[in-house]
């Protein structure tokens, strides 16, 4: 008699609308209960029985109950699940399989089965890709997942690579395809095969995409010719190879190996500027004035060159520093190194005064054995030969940025606008507390930004620099010319790595249109979005593989007295993160390892400091000695403690 009663339905509706609700993100704990985080200030307790309906990271709506003045949340509706597609490890066997997601906050096994069409017979320890199919807040009894892809077996030494690539849905190998003959592009190529072009790279590099040639002019000015590998001479726009490169967007460099953007026949052979091989190039010739500036008379043209020497960074650096035994093959090569060195110093000096120069940070290289085991991690400082190539590439990219801007009005530009305008006042206030006075308006201009950066570089430590980093905007890829504040340049468009960057291939096609005097369409915006997304995924993949290898490398140091110098890179409520100076590993030091009495300890992310009894004991950029307390292989995290 009540089922169709409109009064009862109205009463139910009223009760529902009057019940308090909140939307937020579920945060799990290791103790079974959780919290619904609504914003930075407000969170609600979720009791253990209710946590069984949700997963860490789910965005949900919950009913808020109040009992004895204590509020708790009862999950009611799912807005966005945390897990959709994920990787994990299989438990169980035969028809009773579960999968544990590979995530530090997700420990519960999810019942699963192989999806239709997946032939592999899964067993305990296998790595797999899964997709969530059921969720309790969607009216299902429990969580359930389909296994959509087998990755590898439990003890595969190369699991860090295969699992990471599968997690980010990235390619595992080079694209298929071969370019049989060069295209007829209607370009006249200058024959520069007689000139002493050289390449300078790591000794192991196969995909050499830049060769350099310098000469001194009669008036004492230096002329630099930068020849760049020419994959667009082989790959037609819109072809199968071009579309594959467009999707990949970049060569993916992971510790130990790379997954190229182009087929290896092209990247490591046909296009690579190998010594004593004739190769087509896109070439830029510029004149460096006495003060290091680049003359307006910039020439882009197609050419053929023959590199006369494959030089290695360390050999060239040793020779210039008068150390080591290596010698150039002949006086012609020696003369090139000397001239390129002069250009490097001249351009470096100009950038120091008129743009910005990055501080040199070492690169860390993993030395791997046959089975992917980490034999060593070597810090490779950026030496003078690295800087020769860097200065030449920056100069060439600056030339391309100018030419594309002036002749076409578009291109693929790297744009960085410095500080977010919304943060300008807060930035000025922070700097003022440290005795630096800046105008909030001026610091948003390229000149004002450069001026501040130079003042920060002159500080005795990098502490203040680290504090203002959060106010900076991110670099973007844009078809519109714009300044690059980070480099201190009015515009920056890369074209010097077309074997490994699709954006550089696009700029090659645009520059060729300029050379031929043809009109060409502006690149589509969705291409820049794809490049930005791929760059993000590749960086995450590199970091994930690195974390795994660092955990393997330092595992046997856990619990020992081995000391490592470590730079504090971040402070949070729970402790601080440090980077080991010798190998680049990042470790976490919990607050409990810093001081036993929690009430006497203040960890301030805002200030980048840790105070004990009101006194600053640690701050970001400090270098301290640490030991490794624990390595958690399941989460690839390293826990350190200050050395006694």
Curated annotation (Swiss-Prot):
PROSITE patterns registered for this protein in UniProt: RIBONUCLEASE_II
| Source taxon at top rank | Bacteria
Give the UniProt keywords, A-Z.
Answer: Cytoplasm, Exonuclease, Hydrolase, Nuclease, RNA-binding
Q: Which residues form a coiled coil?
A: none
Q: What reaction is this protein's catalytic activity? A: Exonucleolytic cleavage in the 3'- to 5'-direction to yield nucleoside 5'-phosphates
Give GO BP annotations, semicolon-separated: mRNA catabolic process
Positions of the S1 motif domain:
561-643
One MF annotation (Gene Ontology) recorded for this entry: RNA binding
* Pfam family, any one: RNB
| Keyword Cytoplasm annotated | yes
One Gene Ontology CC term in the entry? cytosol
Its EC number is 3.1.13.1
Does the entry feature the keyword RNA-binding, yes or no?
yes
Q: Where in the cell is it found?
A: Cytoplasm
- Gene3D superfamilies linked to this entry: 2.40.50.640, Nucleic acid-binding proteins
Q: Which InterPro entries does UniProt cross-reference here?
A: CSD (IPR011129), NA-bd_OB-fold (IPR012340), RNase_B_OB_dom (IPR013223), RNase_II (IPR011804), RNase_II/R (IPR001900), RNase_II/R_CS (IPR022966), RNase_II/RNase_R (IPR004476), RNR_Ribonuclease (IPR050180)
Residue span(s) of domain RNB? 189-516
Q: Which family does it belong to?
A: Belongs to the RNR ribonuclease family. RNase II subfamily.
Q: What does this protein do?
A: Involved in mRNA degradation. Hydrolyzes single-stranded polyribonucleotides processively in the 3' to 5' direction.
- Note the PANTHER family from the entry: EXORIBONUCLEASE 2, RIBONUCLEASE
Full protein name: Exoribonuclease 2
Give the originating organism: Salmonella arizonae (strain ATCC BAA-731 / CDC346-86 / RSK2980)
**What is the organism lineage in this UniProt record?**
Bacteria, Pseudomonadati, Pseudomonadota, Gammaproteobacteria, Enterobacterales
């Amino acid at each position: 008699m009540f089922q169709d009663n409109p009064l009862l339905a109205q009463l139910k509706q009223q009760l529902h609308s009057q019940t308090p609700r909140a939307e937020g993100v579920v945060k799990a704990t290791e103790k079974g209960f959780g919290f619904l985080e609504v914003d930075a200030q407000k969170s609600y307790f979720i009791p253990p029985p209710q946590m069984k309906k949700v997963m860490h990271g789910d965005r949900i709506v919950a009913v808020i109950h109040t009992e004895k003045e204590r509020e708790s949340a009862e999950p009611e509706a799912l807005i966005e699940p945390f897990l959709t597609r994920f990787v994990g490890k299989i438990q169980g066997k035969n028809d009773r399989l579960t999968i544990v997601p590979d995530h530090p906050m997700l420990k519960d096994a999810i019942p699963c089965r192989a999806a239709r069409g997946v032939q592999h017979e899964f067993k305990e320890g296998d790595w797999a890709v899964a997709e969530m199919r059921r969720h309790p807040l969607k009216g299902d009894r429990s969580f359930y997942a389909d296994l959509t892809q087998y990755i590898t077996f439990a003890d595969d030494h190369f699991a860090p690579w295969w699992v990471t690539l599968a997690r980010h849905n990235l390619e595992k190998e080079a694209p298929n395809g071969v370019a049989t003959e060069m295209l007829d592009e209607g370009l006249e190529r200058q024959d520069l095969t007689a000139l002493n072009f050289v390449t300078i790279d790591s000794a192991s590099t196969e995909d050499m995409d830049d060769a350099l040639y310098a000469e001194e002019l009669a008036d004492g000015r230096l002329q630099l010719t930068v020849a760049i590998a020419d994959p667009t001479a082989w790959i037609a726009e819109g072809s199968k190879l071009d579309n594959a490169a467009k999707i990949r967007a970049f060569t993916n460099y992971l510790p130990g190996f790379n997954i190229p953007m182009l087929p290896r026949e092209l990247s490591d052979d046909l296009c690579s500027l190998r010594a004593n091989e004739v190769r087509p190039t896109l070439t830029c010739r510029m004149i460096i004035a006495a003060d290091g500036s680049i003359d307006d008379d910039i020439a882009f043209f197609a050419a053929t060159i023959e590199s006369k020497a494959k030089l290695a960074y360390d050999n060239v650096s040793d020779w210039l520093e008068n150390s080591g035994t290596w010698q150039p093959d002949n006086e012609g090569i020696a003369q090139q190194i000397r001239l390129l060195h002069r250009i490097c110093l001249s351009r470096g000096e100009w950038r120091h005064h008129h743009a910005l120069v990055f501080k040199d940070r070492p690169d860390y290289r993993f030395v791997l054995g046959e089975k992917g085991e980490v034999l060593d991690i070597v810090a490779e400082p950026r030496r003078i030969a690295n800087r020769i190539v860097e200065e030449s590439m920056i100069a060439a990219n600056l030339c391309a940025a100018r030419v594309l801007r002036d002749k076409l009005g578009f291109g693929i530009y790297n744009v960085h606008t410095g500080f977010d305008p919304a943060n300008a006042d807060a930035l000025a206030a922070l700097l003022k507390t440290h005795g630096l006075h800046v105008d909030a308006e001026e610091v948003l201009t390229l000149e004002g930004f450069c001026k501040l950066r130079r003042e920060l570089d002159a500080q005795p430590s990098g502490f203040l620099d680290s504090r203002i980093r959060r106010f900076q905007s991110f670099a973007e890829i844009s078809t519109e010319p714009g300044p690059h504040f980070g480099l201190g340049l009015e515009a920056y468009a890369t074209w010097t790595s077309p074997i490994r960057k699709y954006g550089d291939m696009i700029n090659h096609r645009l520059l060729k249109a300029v050379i031929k005097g043809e009109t060409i369409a502006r690149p589509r915006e969705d291409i820049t979005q794809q490049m930005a997304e791929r760059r993000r995924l590749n960086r995450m993949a590199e970091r994930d593989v690195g974390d795994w290898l660092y955990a393997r490398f330092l595992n046997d140091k856990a619990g020992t007295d081995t000391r490592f110098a470590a730079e504090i890179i971040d402070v949070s409520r729970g402790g601080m993160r440090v980077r080991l100076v010798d190998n680049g590993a990042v470790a976490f030091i919990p607050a409990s390892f810093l001081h036993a009495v929690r009430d006497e300890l203040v960890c301030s992310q805002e200030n980048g400091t840790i105070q004990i009894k009101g006194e600053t004991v640690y701050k970001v950029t400090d270098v301290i000695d640490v030991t490794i307390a624990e390595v958690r292989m399941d989460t690839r995290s390293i826990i350190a403690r200050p050395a006694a």
